[in-house]
Amino acid sequence: VRGVILAAGQGQRLRPDTDALPKTLLPVTATETILDTIVRGLAEVGVTDLAITVGHAAERIREHAPVLEDRYGVSVAIVDNDKPHWNNAYSLWTAREHYAHGAVLVNGDTVHPTSIERNLLAAAATDPRLLIALDDHKQLTDEAMKVRVGAGGVELIHKQQPIATAAGEYIGVSLIPTGVAEDLTKALEATYTRDTTLYYEDAFQLLAEAGQIGTVSTGPVAWTEVDDHADWALAKTIAEGL
């Protein structure tokens, strides 16, 4: 199983801190960036063959890759996103060769404990579907990537849906099994071809409608997606405990 990290984003709401920096390289401890915490977590569960998609300020991640390799004992392949102004459905599609034989997918702006990856890998041993980490404990907001679950698995993954009928929030970490990889690639292509501003979760929705997505609970853990300065402050607090 490989690791695929989506790190092409700037994070407009984090400017000017991200003017010359991808948001994944924002520091969260004295020695680690967001990206460091992700790579360390993957290495801790034995996922050491990594691909990182780059776009905004790509050279900064290129410079940091050898540090990641030395520090965490991983190998890093850089995947160039030639259309960084498109959304992440395209960004993930550019990494299709890297998830073809199974991968843990992590959004480059999420700070979370390693238990997330560990639980996904354990569940994948008996569940052949694409599995998403679902926080079914926290209070949902309008901004959350909400997930509705039915008897056959995920039915709807979208921010625009009623909080009342959502089971939880997708935290931006998932497991792509070999058996679903080709269908995911086709779904991603259909998604960005339809609209370049769409997210990879819009491709996940196509798979959900075919009964190909399951959920794994995060349990009551602290995590955050870093979209603004308040999130960044929270990420620093969480990272200190990882």
State each model region's role.
Residues 24, 75-77, 212-214:
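Conserved beta-strand segments of alpha/beta enzyme cores
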Residues 1-3, 167-242:
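Conserved alpha/beta core of the MobA/IspD/sugar-nucleotide pyrophosphorylase nucleotidyltransferase superfamily
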Residues 20-36:
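Short catalytic helix/loop segments, enriched in acidic residues and glycine
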Residues 25, 147-149, 215:
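A structural signal for short hydrophobic beta-strand segments in well-ordered beta-sheet cores
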Residues 69-145, 149:
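Conserved beta-loop-beta/alpha segment of the NTase-like Rossmann-fold superfamily
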Residues 1-5, 32-103, 194:
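Conserved N-terminal catalytic core of the sugar/cofactor nucleotidyltransferase
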Residues 113-193:
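Conserved core of the sugar-phosphate nucleotidyltransferase
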Residues 1-19:
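N-terminal nucleotide-binding beta1-loop-alpha1 segment
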